[in-house]
Structure formats: structure tokens, C-alpha cells
Amino acid sequence: MYKDEMIQLHQFLVYVLKYLENGYDIKDECEEYFSLNISPHHIHRTKAEHKYAIFVLSSAISEILARKEGNNLPPNVVNGLSELARRSRKEVVKMEARLEAK
């Protein structure tokens, strides 16, 4: 996926989060995403950073939806997205280490 496509996906997920904000308390689930301080408008950030933000945000959204009463979201979806966020974080850390070594 190209960086501009990732930024568009990131923006879409932010819209989904804003929609969910009206009906749910989202603060706890989104704490990690908010602490990243990476928004879709930060086009200077790397593709890997946006990818990480997308996975963290997707994981938070899935946790919010899983918590909803009567929701049939399987737990493996939430777990899978959390695992993808964890792997993506490792990529960002490696990239930052390479940049610092230069």
C-alpha cells in the first residue's frame, strides 16, 4: 500500500472513531493511539509510523465494538489487531534505531 493510501485509511479510521465517540466512552481504549501523537494530517511522518497508528487505532475500534452489548465480534479479531499493532511497533523501533545509527 502506498503512503498516501495509508493516510487516507488513517483518516477514515479517525472518522469512525469520531462516530463511535458519540455513543461510547472511548478514552480508555484510545489512550495508546492518542499518546502516539500521529494524525492523518502529519504527512511528514513515515509510512511505518502511519501503519503503526492505523493498527493501534483499528485495535482500539475493535475493542470498543467488542464491548458493545450484543455484539458478535469474535475475540480473535481484537487479538489479531493487537498483535499486528505490536509487530508494527517493532518495525518503527528498528527504523528509528537505524536512523539514530547514521
Curated annotation (Swiss-Prot):
It comes from the Archaea. InterPro entries: UPF0058, UPF0058_sf. SUPFAM superfamilies: Vng1086c-like. Belongs to the UPF0058 family. This is UPF0058 protein MTH_224. It comes from Methanothermobacter thermautotrophicus (strain ATCC 29096 / DSM 1053 / JCM 10044 / NBRC 100330 / Delta H) (Methanobacterium thermoautotrophicum). The lineage of its organism: Archaea, Methanobacteriati, Methanobacteriota, Methanomada group, Methanobacteria.
